[in-house]
Design a protein with these regions (language model features):
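Catalytic cores of glycan-processing enzymes that make or break glycosidic bonds
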Residues: 1-191
Length: 191
């Protein structure tokens, strides 16, 4: 059964890390385009869907929840004097005044590959960790089956703090249910 489990998870991740025996049963899967663990989710898992949000009176805006939420002030706070260069090199401004990664940098993996190719550019090496961080400025991850999973510690993101209090409270309740009720039932039944 464990070989089957590992083979199945190879569809979603290049590598799996098992910290302890519980990790063998509750596998944390990081999609191939991501590098950081906060952009992973349990496999198997009971994903969220749009109705889970609507039932809690949360307007489901997939782009707002699943794409990095990057404002001009966040870029200036992170990059200080280099903010202008970073905006021009890595981002495009969208119709809402927010910043989206350019297509060639729209995943952590693409960003890392670019920086590794630019070995002589000290400036790029210095900003890599901040750019990777910006990729994690999300509330939800979308899986290959169009289900949604909360980003770990979403409450610590600028994206979350930018929401109104009612939405934050509702998301917190759903987050707690997702991690501590919904998944436990699945693992209890399939453990």
């Amino acid at each position: 059964w464990w070989e089957k489990k590992l083979n199945h998870n190879s569809k979603y991740a290049d590598a799996l890390r098992l910290d302890h025996v519980l990790g063998f049963f509750r596998i944390w899967s990081i999609p191939k385009d991501n590098i950081q663990g906060v952009l992973g989710y349990f496999q198997p898992a009971i994903a969220l869907n749009e109705n889970d949000f609507l039932q809690r009176n949360i307007y489901f805006d997939e782009k707002r929840f699943c794409k990095p939420y990057i404002t001009e002030s966040l870029l200036h706070d992170l990059f200080l004097d280099e903010a202008g260069y970073v905006k021009e090199k890595f981002f495009i401004q969208n119709v809402y005044g927010l910043f989206d990664f350019k297509n060639e940098f729209d995943t952590q993996k693409k960003l890392q590959e670019f920086i590794l190719q630019e070995k002589n550019e000290v400036q790029h090496q210095k900003i890599l960790s901040k750019l990777l961080y910006l990729h994690s400025e999300i509330i939800l991850l979308k899986d290959a089956e169009n289900g949604f999973h909360f980003r770990v510690n979403m409450q610590q993101t600028f994206s979350f703090h930018s929401l109104d209090e009612q939405v934050k409270n509702q998301l917190n309740h759903l987050y707690h249910e997702y991690f501590f009720s919904r998944q436990n039932e699945l693992w209890r039944n399939n453990g």
